[in-house]
Amino acid sequence: MSEKVIDVQDAWRDRALIDEAKYKEMYEASVSGPETFWGEHGKRIDWSTPFSKVKNTSFAPGDVSIKWFEDGKTNVALNCIDRHLATRGDQTAIIWEGDDPNESKHITYRQLHAEVCRMANVLRNRGVGKGDRVTLYLPMIPEAAYAMLACARLGAIHAIVFGGFSPDSLASRIKGCGSKLVITADEGLRGGRKVPLKANVDEAIKRLDKDLVDHVIVVKRTGGNVAMEPGRDVYYHEAAEQVTDECPAEAVEAEHPLFILYTSGSTGQPKGVVHTTGGYLVYASMTHQYVFDYHDGDVYWCTADVGWVTGHSYIVYGPLANGATTLMFEGIPTYPSNSRFWEVIDKHNVNIFYTAPTAIRSLMGGGEGPVKKTSRQSLRVLGSVGEPINPEAWDWYYRVVGDSRCPIVDTWWQTETGGILITPLPGATRLKPGSATLPFFGVQPVMVDAEGKILDGACEGNLCIKDSWPGQMRTVYGDHERFEQTYFSTYKDLYFTGDGARRDADGYYWITGRVDDVINVSGHRMGTAEVESSLVAHPKVSEAAVVGYPHNVKGQGIYAYVTLNEGEEGTDELRKELVTWVRKDIGPIASPDLLQFAPGLPKTRSGKIMRRILRKIAEDDFGSLGDTSTLAEPAVVDDLIENRQNRSA
């Protein structure tokens, strides 16, 4: 692991909301007196009925219950739109950048208010009210944000399904939450290609009971020719012409559900993660402000899709609650060229940029040229999200993208946590490439061993969280028992994250990957992230993924999939060189037993590597790869199978 330390630059400290001393003071207050701390910070949002109870939480076996600000009433849309109208009605709320670089628009807070009210009225006219579930299956267009906020305005519960999911996956999610209404688009656009969203919705509905979905609202994105079912389907623009742009907001209880978001479980059955209104918005807005050192007037861009939790918390709810200008991007980092991210930053003078390590690594493969031909002078803070960022990618991001003048906030959190839990703060935290560093306010990480014993000091183990924070998920939709079983049964009175971590002598946390991404080689535990970091540090390697496979002698062997930089050739000589490289870097125990050169890795459309598929291929067992509907490029898998290194079966 990297032991390089980057001190807080004077320029970061001088402009930051919080310095190191202030962080320590606030953190101490947040864990020693959470009621007082969150009682104060709960006032950062507006309440129609002020709360008097701050925290009412229990992680006790058989009695897991999480409530924050429970006697208060508020509305998320009021906080994200209406309260800003008097002071910043004409400020841009959303910059929308289309898949095609010639397509973009600015939406002010006043326009956002009108659009959200219009959408809410369209929903209300179709019987949607407080507590009803609405499924959104949309591309990254402004209507996705309008639909989220329209549901919130009415007290309805949105359940977004990422536009890359298959009709089967969509159907199971519509059924899971019992949505009577679906909002979609005729087609999506990604990297110049059309995505058949409406056709997928039609296929999904065919798999459901006839009387479940009553209405499908279709946003016209491409104007593509799609089938419309009379009496069920309506084009949004036609429905919107029939309603006004004024709609009262429903005050709801702090613990009223805001959204359900399905996330994959280790059993393969997706879990409906439930986030509620008050605590979630307090936490999303507070983390957005302090983690990104957000100042009034900053242009902020998170490259995620609203189909994932990062898009919920850090494209829509957190930024808009703070009156920010947030950028929504429909496209991909490599279309029409590898410079797209950096061109968008220059075009819109982006100050804060938040993306995933997988995007950074894929762009690294194309070299510095596409970055260096742009200015990027507006950038002030860089962020990373979605998986641990290996030190080499961190260094490239810092040096090449940020010209060594922007702090990187390497954020660790989960769908279940609602917001960022472990992260540097730009003006307060010395940085170590590859480390998520220190906990955010109110977050108490603990390290435990396999037996559940709490570990002190520098150590390696399983990462748990002691005590609740306002953004925490409340339950699994319709299955509270599964919630308790998944997160609270492994270690008593602790929230188990499912991730392994290392804590160093400075108290910094290094996330080593999912606990199921740990390989046991000859009785030694080896985090796959560590081996991957070592491989990616080699100058010829762009990306690597490491999994275990059954080994006659060691129990598990190490199987590495390696994607080389453009122009490099995968030879036997290079294979040996890479094995020696890892051996020297980490030690003989970490040497890959099998190494396969791969032109690409199987990824979901959100950029996550599908390790389950890699494990199956490494085990020479690819007859049942399971659900591959979320794969961005299915052809990648065929190549991996054809060139697999283990043919033992």
Curated annotation (Swiss-Prot):
InterPro entries: Ac_CoA_lig, ACAS_N, AMP-bd_C, AMP-bd_C_sf, AMP-binding_CS, AMP-dep_synth/lig_dom, ANL_N_sf. CoA binds at R190, G191, G192, R193, T310, S522, R583. Its EC number is 6.2.1.1. Mg(2+) binds at V536, H538, V541. SUPFAM superfamilies: Acetyl-CoA synthetase-like. The modification N6-acetyllysine is found at K608. Gene3D superfamilies: 3.30.300.30, N-terminal domain of ligase-like. Acetylated. Deacetylation by the SIR2-homolog deacetylase activates the enzyme. Its cofactor is Mg(2+). CDD domains: ACS. It catalyses: acetate + ATP + CoA = acetyl-CoA + AMP + diphosphate. Pfam families: ACAS_N, AMP-binding, AMP-binding_C. Coiled coil: none annotated. The keyword Nucleotide-binding applies. GO terms for biological process: acetyl-CoA biosynthetic process from acetate. ATP binds at G386, E387, P388, D410, T411, W412, W413, Q414, T415, D499, R514, R525. Keywords: Acetylation, ATP-binding, Ligase, Magnesium, Metal-binding, Nucleotide-binding. One of its GO terms (molecular function) is ATP binding. GO terms for cellular component: cytosol. Belongs to the ATP-dependent AMP-binding enzyme family. Catalyzes the conversion of acetate into acetyl-CoA (AcCoA), an essential intermediate at the junction of anabolic and catabolic pathways. AcsA undergoes a two-step reaction. In the first half reaction, AcsA combines acetate with ATP to form acetyl-adenylate (AcAMP) intermediate. In the second half reaction, it can then transfer the acetyl group from AcAMP to the sulfhydryl group of CoA, forming the product AcCoA. PANTHER family: ACETYL-COENZYME A SYNTHETASE (PTHR24095), ACETYL-COENZYME A SYNTHETASE 1 (PTHR24095:SF14). This is Acetyl-coenzyme A synthetase. The gene is acsA.
